[in-house]
Amino acid sequence: MQEKISKFEDFLTQLQQNITTALEQHETNAAKFISDKWQKPDTPDQKLKGYGNSMIIEGGEIFEKGVVAFSRVHGSELPPSATAKRQELAGKSFIATGLSLVIHPRNPFVPTSHANFRIFIAGADTDNPIWWFGGGFDLTPYYPFEEDAIHWHQTAKNICDKHDKTYYPKFKKWCDEYFYLKHRDECRGVGGLFFDDLNDKSFDECFNFVTDCANSYLDAYIPIVAQRKNIEYSQKHKDFQLYRRGRYVEFNLVFDRGTIFGLQSGGRTESILSSMPPMATWKYNWQPELGSEEEKVYQYIKPRDWIK
């Protein structure tokens, strides 16, 4: 099992380089991804041990902030967030390896994107370790372009159909349900793919699906960035982007499993919260004007079948 974990780690660290390089090619000022390598001290008082590399870009003309973060951690006991639905895992040691990214563009017409790909192994030090993969990618637009959502979902469907034709409808629905703010009765964006507890096939089959899915993120996102990054925008557009970013913050702090897992397990706070946008605003009881561009996004982000 250790060999398989290391193989996935090698894939993720190379993917991190591929993604940061591709995004930098669209940046028009001197902003670059900066590498922040870290290691948790291996001491008895540390609940979580391990290492990682958080790559951050800030202050770009295209990307106001972005993080592409790799981590490999292990602990003696899974935190409550990881065992809430799987009580049989309570008390087991674990290894978790993953890559998580969030890109916050400056231009309000370029959507925010998020992706995450990970493996968990519970009881890795036992004769019968339990493994599963999780991950996916989702898109959060501030202004609606239907062709962008169609391209995003078509890319997701193509990669799913290559492995299992039941995956896209199942993981698309799961994504719509997961990235939902209950207290707002709103979806975070137009979705994409979300899956967890993936071990329905052999390890190699699941590994191949997850790595193909991860490699398709750039195919899904870069064409949208290229198409929208030079659209002129006003302060009104920027203000609405900042307001909608507030929803992103609310979801990450209240509902996101990765954030909750990281904080409960004693993870590296600076890396866990690096996905937060650089700026966000809240306005009391604000409502968009009827028929405005801003109102349209509330219909646009409702779950629908994007691929006819």
Swiss-Prot record:
Binding site for substrate: 100, 116-118, 266-268
Active site (catalytic residues): 114 (proton donor)
InterPro entries for the chain: Coprogen_oxidase_aer (IPR001260), Coprogen_oxidase_aer_sf (IPR036406), Coprogen_oxidase_CS (IPR018375)
Chief place where the protein resides: cytoplasm
Cofactor: a divalent metal cation
Marked site (Important for dimerization) residue numbers: 183
Pathway annotation: Porphyrin-containing compound metabolism; protoporphyrin-IX biosynthesis; protoporphyrinogen-IX from coproporphyrinogen-III (O2 route): step 1/1
Protein name: Oxygen-dependent coproporphyrinogen-III oxidase
Organism in which the protein naturally occurs: Francisella tularensis subsp. tularensis (strain WY96-3418)
